[in-house]
Amino acid sequence: MPPPLHIRTYHQLTEADRSGLGEQVGAQHRRVAERLAPVHRIVAVMSGKGGVGKSFVTALLARALARAGQRVGALDADLNGPTLARLLDARGPLAVTAGGVEPVAGTDGVRCVSMAHLLEDGKPLAFKGPGSDAFIWRGALEAAALRELLGDVTWGALDVLLVDLPPGVARLHELLDLLPAPPDVLAVTIATVESADAVRRALNAARERGARLLGVIENMAGPQFPGDGGDTLSREFAIPLLARIPFNPGDAIWQTLAERL
């Protein structure tokens, strides 16, 4: 059985627990900083909207970096729709040692941690909250789960940790609140105006929080998705268009992308 996250429901918290939440969160932040100290670089991969192949890009980029000789970790921060472990063939369960939770080694040695390692196949992530306020408590528990995935995992010495963010900007803000320093940010879009609009908002949010924008990747490039979304975002934010990735790309494009990072 996979190890459970050490998260209690609202009803399981005592008054002492509730009054000490600030201290507990501070301790978790310090633990995150300690765990990530051996990690040379953190890159958050974001899209702003779903359906652009962001997790696919994250997985193939992680493998290319590993093949280039880098020590690579990959965290699936999409708690509700985790796919990164499957894309990296990182089969669980996670192993718990005296030092913490060990990542699962996937293809090309990429060290992966995903909520999929903690859930039974096909089971949704479900947090319980107090009655009509459950949606508020659910958000707090998801943030706590992200803290534990960062703070309880023995990532070890890594050249780069890729964090696969879910669509939107909420998880980006949670990540930025947790990390001791802002990460680098890589944006994935398709060429359409609609995708570029969503990614624009996400990039603005990242820039306002002090993250360094590495560039944009236009995925699924070709006649199926007309437009110039990648070029538009590159011009607006003065960041490079790192790659146009077609359907069924070969290995060479991933190696080139890894070199550009």
Task: Report residues per predicted region.
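Helical mechanochemical/support elements of P-loop NTPase systems and associated helical scaffolds
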Residues: 35-38, 57, 61, 79-80, ...
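Residue-level signature of catalytic and energy-coupling elements of molecular machines
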Residues: 39, 50, 76, 84, ...
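NTP-binding/hydrolysis catalytic cores, primarily Walker-type P-loop NTPases
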Residues: 1-4, 237, 246-261
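Phosphate-binding loop that captures ATP/GTP phosphates
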Residues: 71-73, 77-125, 231
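Walker A/P-loop phosphate-binding motif and the immediately C-terminal alpha-helix
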Residues: 41-78, 203
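Conserved catalytic-core segment of NTP-binding enzymes
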Residues: 152-251
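Switch II (G3) loop of P-loop NTPases
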Residues: 78, 96, 116-175, 179
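Extreme N-terminal, non-catalytic leader segments
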Residues: 1-49
